[in-house]
């Protein structure tokens, strides 16, 4: 089988293209990355890419391929017209624009990082507001300081019409459940906006350097670890109305949640911070995207967590993206018309306040 880096997945047998079978309701791709060159220019030379697990734990073959991918996809990552053409070919009415993962800059130890984050949010907002019929935007946050991050949330939501924020699942040595981030979760709840969790490799990735394992295994593993901490460290308990939206189908935990419930029932050290419910009950409050590639895995997520908690996404424009998200949903057996409309756009419209 030939390699198709930016086309249909070999993870399933495809049916009719989604553009031909799409529902009449609004379709939304809720996981799409946009590169902000102005921010990259600001931090140039201020950090070592080897501080980022996705780069540090990659062999030379992977590194070379990733460099080529950025060259191949630079127009998709930066050019609105290129993006709109792709959306039209997929049958996507609206994209949720999200920063590229390595532009979180949590490892930049400088005031310049705050300026870079502000620049990213301003440019994302500008891009979305210039085409309100096709885009909304999620921002990013200066996670070096939880108080400054909370203030940036207020600015972005109140002044820029930002609809939520992407946060990387591990923050330069700190878990997302760290007390210094409590204000972020409280502010997200107050503003009634979702937080999108996205990985960027796995920090303990020595065994994952070959075969792109740092992404294939490492990304869902890092997400899995982050969700465990948010649940067991009490973040979800303390913030019952917090809306968490998770990339790549939520990593490994949604498919193996009975293990955390078993541990919670069997061991006192798994009781966490006064958890009032089974760990999986907190997981069921979260939302998961559809980037799992196979029909059976998507059907499992829908059956286990409800169609109202599954949100269509692609991870555009990378080679690990889902190229035909509508076909993926439409080809999943046993879904009702209402479920299809929720997953392909309705849930995203509710989460991100899209009219």
Listing of model-derived features with the role each one plays in the protein:
Residues 110-114, 214, 327-330:
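Short glycine-enriched, charge-decorated loop/helix-capping segments at active-site entrances
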Residues 3-10, 128, 132-134, 154-311:
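Catalytic pocket-lining loop regions of alpha/beta-barrel enzymes
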Residues 102-129, 147-155, 175-186:
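Active-site loop-helix segments enriched in His/Asp/Glu that coordinate
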Residues 143, 199-203, 316-318:
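Short glycine-enriched loops at secondary-structure junctions
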Residues 89-99, 203-204:
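Short coil-to-beta-strand
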Residues 24, 33-77, 203-221, 260-283:
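Active-site gating loops and adjacent loop-to-helix segments of metal-dependent hydrolytic enzymes
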Residues 1-26, 30, 37-94, 122-130, ...:
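Mid-to-C-terminal alpha-helical segments outside catalytic/metal-binding sites
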Residues 104-106, 149, 203-210, 320-322:
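Short acidic/His/Gly/Ser-rich catalytic and metal-binding motifs that mark active-site loops
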